[in-house]
């Protein structure tokens, strides 16, 4: 950021401002014309002798204003104001209502209407005639107007996205920067008004989105294009003259002439960037920069009176218009004078005293307390019987999660991200906080979705403040009843998990008291909106609980809920379980088999795609040569190949969905293994999320887990084997000769 700043002379804020223009309507000095999105046109006179904020006139139109231009567009009439709107091009004349020229009015002369919305325009100067206006529509078609006549209309360009346009009178060339390409067109080609697409003389790939274009006249005309990340200059033949790389995003650009140096060899330009900086260049040489204290989207260099010539006029996105000039005094600090004498002995004593205070403060625990930042609390709110959200399962209940924030002073907005397998109206929420409030809260409903069945009831909330760059994250488990409802038990389910306890089993109808079951030894649950069921059984003789289901993904969430309820009902009881490694191996085998089939389908898709393209090429060649006899055979072959291609793509998508479901089941088994290991007081890194949110293969993740989650015993053995050439104690190692004798 520059140390120098722009000194403000005149400023005013007009809401919904879209464009600004400097034009001379009287007294051989310039006035400022401001156009708005609401159709308002304001003509102000900053160089007025009494007040700088003097407004000549304000006119309301019915259309949003895109661009304005001022010139002698009509014969025998000077300084006509041309206003471009999405549907009209309107000409206005300025009439003064008072003899002292302090008040004026805008009178509409005539207008041209468009059938397609306009995008921008440029002025085409004509020797010994009135200037013309070239308008580009939103679909990249050009229309030329001269006064009240339309020369031609809707001439198409070879582009889809409109961009800046400019005209060079010296070479009579039109420049367009559409689709990220700068192209040159001879203006004489468009004089016929043909509806055929026009060929370019030359084109250049800018590699970025063009924002603004300026064209300079003279013996060496130059086209200067401002893009988001660079400024490029081109000569008449399309060669790059120079280029400037911007450190921030470019916002606006304007050219100007120096009042003291009359040298047309160089181009002088001002570029504004998104980091509130104005860059003043002489061609590609940076001669000055300053802090604009705003990010201008429009720039002008105007002379409003003889006292303030070549002042800079800027327009901000919020409608603030500032007229100022470059300051030469740094606004951050001033360098000390060279005559200041520093007493180094006193400075050293001062540093020693400060160091002693810091040591005493550290010994006492520190005098500076760490700022806690934003505090977040999660709690379960109302549980409703049925939600009306469109993405919810049929007859699914909802649960409101209350998110409470505290210590949010000076925080205006919080970005909340939601991570949960349960559905909600939105995964991203923006919470607006009042500036005078220190607390805020929001309720977010959760329910079972209609597209994806959840395998976990865990909800993670992350709140981020863009201003302070602070982020807080909390997690909570949704109630079990939000996901499941009571159903019939299934004793013949394929997948089982056993939970052992040191004490007698507890009645299941008491553990799950919110359900209406009266059976103390068996209870069944089904996921809302689906036929997925899970059953829980209690065995009094063996003091065990058994969980059975046809869906692996339901074992983990049910076992976790069961263990939590047992621990709450009987504190201190020992609980354990057997990790189902055979289910993991079975799921891994199925994933590998599906991935093999997916690779075969991918090869088949590539083969059929090449075959379809070859048939299309043969068909086009036959049409060009006129050999139409083999078209029925090619049509039949194309139909067969295309159907096989569609079948292979359907199979590929189906296998991809199956692989994702199997991966979700495997992640659930990993979390189940982590939960059962934790019951035995063994923490492991292999949980349900260590592979879920990565793009790595399972083999790579397991390698990382083995290196990361190793016990001290394995580390000791590894170090001993790598660095100890001695024999291990208490282990008899026989020599090779003795082994050979025993073998003989």
Curated annotation (Swiss-Prot):
It holds the Pfam family PTHB1_pf. Signal peptide: none annotated. Residues 722-733 have a biased composition (Basic and acidic residues). Residues 722-744 are annotated as: Disordered. GO terms for biological process: cilium assembly; protein transport. GO terms for cellular component: BBSome; ciliary basal body; cilium; membrane. It comes from the Eukaryota. InterPro entries: PHTB1_N_dom, PTHB1, PTHB1_hp_dom, PTHB1_pf_dom, WD40_repeat_dom_sf. Disruption phenotype: Mutants have normal body morphology, but with reduced body length and width, delayed larval development and decreased roaming movements. Defective cilia structure and function characterized by an increased accumulation and mislocalization of intraflagellar transport proteins and impaired movement of intraflagellar transport proteins along the ciliary axoneme. Disrupted assembly of the BBSome complex at the base of the cilia. Defective avoidance of nitric oxide and P.aeruginosa. Residues 734-744 have a biased composition (Acidic residues). Keywords: Cilium biogenesis/degradation, Protein transport, Transport. Component of the BBSome complex. The BBSome complex is thought to function as a coat complex required for sorting of specific membrane proteins to the primary cilia. The BBSome complex is required for ciliogenesis but is dispensable for centriolar satellite function. Required for proper BBSome complex assembly and its ciliary localization. Required for cilia biogenesis and both the assembly and movement of intraflagellar transport proteins along the ciliary axoneme. Part of BBSome complex, that contains bbs-1, bbs-2, bbs-4, bbs-5, osm-12, bbs-8/ttc-8 and bbs-9. Interacts with bbs-1. This is Protein pthb1 homolog. It comes from Caenorhabditis elegans. The gene is bbs-9.
